[in-house]
């Protein structure tokens, strides 16, 4: 699989996860605007550093792949909010 196909696969997984979480939480991510999303990104970065450094998942069933996919989605959410301005 080439890099473009890999990116399509990741984006497809991200969209599926976003769709599921958006059904559960709605647009809660927009409540505090871009700053709020950036704070969530910081949380995810700290989680990924902890997983990478210690090999320990602080959240049950959430490994590095899940955390990186969340980061992908949070970046997209921040872009959505920026486009609304």
Regions found by a protein language model. Give the residues of each.
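Intrinsically disordered, low-complexity regulatory regions
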Residues: 1-85
């Amino acid at each position: 699989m080439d890099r473009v196909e890999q990116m399509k696969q990741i984006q497809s997984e991200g969209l599926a996860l976003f769709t599921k979480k958006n059904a559960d939480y709605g647009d809660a991510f927009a409540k505090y605007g871009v700053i709020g999303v950036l704070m969530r990104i910081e949380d995810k970065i700290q989680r990924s550093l902890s997983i990478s450094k210690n090999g320990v998942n602080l959240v049950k069933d959430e490994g590095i792949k899940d955390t990186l996919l969340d980061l992908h989605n949070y970046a997209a959410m921040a872009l959505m909010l920026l486009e609304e301005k």
